[in-house]
Amino acid sequence: MITMDNIIRDGNPTLRARAKAIEFPLSEEDKKLAHDMMEFLENSQNPEIAKKYHLRAGVGLAAPQVDVSKRMTAVLVPGIEDDDEPIFKHVLINPTILSESVQLAALGEGEGCLSVDRDIPGYVPRHDRIKLRWYDLDGNKHVERLRDYPAIVVQHEIDHLNGILFYDHINKEQPLTVPEGTIILE
């Protein structure tokens, strides 16, 4: 089981490296990693389990965050209500953004990261809509359009695969000024 102790923190060089593509068929090690990453997200969103194991809630976890430099990320965007099915729940292998909207969006409360322990205020402009290609654990190709919050989460996770952290996108001189043309998602 992955816990916060397994998640590397800002400053570790793995977080700044471009992760390597994964070959199919997946190794047993890669399958276990995929399972464990999704399990962490599920556990982190369960208040009882999160409290018991001191987990910070997360909606995404990339392999580099557990010190594995491979192009794999787990994403679990929960439904609006507790009983709702997740909006987006997948382990993405070798994900690629095929196209993106001109329209930018940012989260009103800013972004956070399991690998960054400090609060870094500022708007993180991202594309409001993306067309995403990824492979599942069996090597099947998927193409899906995402918008708003799920699109932002996936872009954050793909950044991890490219050695980019969310605060790299924040305007250093005016972090709390909304970038021109950016819509704010609350």
Curated annotation (Swiss-Prot):
Residues bound to Fe cation: 113, 156, 160
GO biological process: co-translational protein modification; translation
Active site per database record: 157
Family matches, as Pfam families: Pep_deformylase
Cofactor(s), names only, from the UniProt record: Fe(2+)
Molecular function via GO: metal ion binding; peptide deformylase activity
Record field: catalytic activity: N-terminal N-formyl-L-methionyl-[peptide] + H2O = N-terminal L-methionyl-[peptide] + formate
This protein's record includes keyword Metal-binding: yes
Cofactor descriptive note: Binds 1 Fe(2+) ion.
Entry EC number(s): 3.5.1.88
InterPro entries registered for this protein in UniProt: Peptide_deformylase, Peptide_deformylase_sf
Keywords: Hydrolase, Iron, Metal-binding, Protein biosynthesis
Record carries keyword Transmembrane helix: no
HAMAP family the UniProt entry points to: Pep_deformylase
Function of the molecule: Removes the formyl group from the N-terminal Met of newly synthesized proteins. Requires at least a dipeptide for an efficient rate of reaction. N-terminal L-methionine is a prerequisite for activity but the enzyme has broad specificity at other positions.
Similarity comment: Belongs to the polypeptide deformylase family.
Protein's recorded name: Peptide deformylase
Native species: Ligilactobacillus salivarius (strain UCC118)
